[in-house]
Amino acid sequence: MQWEIVALNNPTFDTPAILKKLADVLDREKRSKGAARRKSETGFGGGSARKSFGSNSVSTPPMMNTRTIKRMAGHSRRVDEFSSSAQAKASATKRAKIGGASGIRFDFTTPTKSGALAVSSPIAATTSPICTTGAYKERKDMGKIEIDHNSALEACKPQEKPVEIEILSKVDDSRYMYSTIEQRAEELENQMCEMRQLFKQKHGWEEDDFSPVGFLSAEPVLVCGRICCEAPNGKLNAKSLLLEGSRIHSNGARVKMEVESTLPVYSLFPGQIVVAKGRCPSGHTLHVTELYSEIPPESPKVDNQEKQSLSMMCAVGPFSTQEDLEYEPLEDLLGVVNETQPDVLLLMGPFVHDKHPQIASCLPTKLIEDTPVALTFQDVFTFLLTRIAASVENLKTRVVLCPSTEDIMHHHISFPQPAFHVNMDQLELKDRQQMTFISNPGIISINGISIGVTTQDTLLHLAQEDVVKLDKNKPKKMRIARLAEHMVTQRSFYPLFPPSQEAMLDFTKRRAFVMPVQPDLLFMSSKLKHFVNDIADKTLCINPGKLTRGKNGGVFAKIYVVPQNVDDKGLQDEEELKKKHSILPRTKVQVIRI
């Protein structure tokens, strides 16, 4: 049945319509087989009467089973709402098929738009989507400190006045995923030319010092290009490394790179722009002897930064467990906010997760006075924002919200994303500046401290593609820190190309995820384990972890930037001054279980 395969692979099909169609097809098959059986019994065509097959010999079609209905009802996801009803209807269908029933009928009642759900609705039939089974409430190690970075430092007190938040970079609204191959190729070319110019400025090279990629030479030459894989859809390794030149300087030529036997250490990934020095006697293989890949941006200049302090809390969605949409973990987090009253609360999406069982099945509900009420996606999002606004209304805490590509309520599904469009009148805040909506990615400045934020899982995608050779004689750097460092040294919140399918990247908006300045703090969301690491000499990279993990609680982060009193009158060296004013030695980070 070809339509079944189409249905399984098309999440937009309506579930009741699918099951009704399935019932009709099975009914037609039953009638067809019944006619064939009568034909064989009467010996149609002049032959003798044949033995009649018993009803038990008619088997259920291979596609029609409980697992199939579960997949069709949940669009290949585990949706609790349909599990009980699907199993019951699967058993009824099988009995009807074996017993020779005259027909199959399914009864699916559409839930009401508002008010209490009908008793006959799939949600009312089971309590699992709207009642907590206790997995979150029975969690252990509440308040346990998982990471204590710079534990010797004391937590600083919140400031007496609300802090000022300045947005340093943002993403404008535009038509996303509306581009041609020529436009994407042009952006790739522009990126390579810009990075080439930055390499020249940093190392003092001239244009005459460079040669085209693939230039035949027995002497060492300098070439600039992008790392790519020899196989179009293959995984990068030391044997499949290619260097692709720009169209304007190398006519887009590619040359194989030999690094395994010539370089003691390297860390490469597809899309990385590098300058390589080596010999290319055949014109087909470049024997690399030197590799330049780091070109971090400058830090923003701020006066009197040593006098500034900052207390923050940061949490990454989902903010509700998969059992319900009650947002209990968020309520617990807001309780901690009321106790500690930090200067800033940074919340990173998803806020209404598109993979939540109730959201994926388009049946969001909430308990209101012990009664399940059907909600729209907008209802859930508005309730969430209203609850956050109400919890900080009487505090000096500023709230910063960054969206995610997994947010069902965001109007922009590709990366990079502009900020949420929110009607502030609905939140009824006395001070509208108390909530700030930033883009994904975004860079903000608070008390002279620059903060980069992204919910794109760049770390996971880099971890799946990088090729590395480490120096055994040097201290081993954490892999996570090395991957995060690529973002800063390549000046991009997403330096990988071609991107992962999960990234939903719109490369024509490349300039929107370029890192214009090197942030002091870099917050990123990743499925990888939470961590805190110094990267690129100036940046503290923080993955706070998820606030929830399935049905269980997760972690959040507390950040304290302690003011530094340094007598720098005797310091004449600029680099020494930068080290003294760095926030790395005066930042305390705690990752705590909710």
Model segments located where?
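Extended recognition/assembly regions associated with phosphoester-bond processing machinery
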Residues: M1-I594
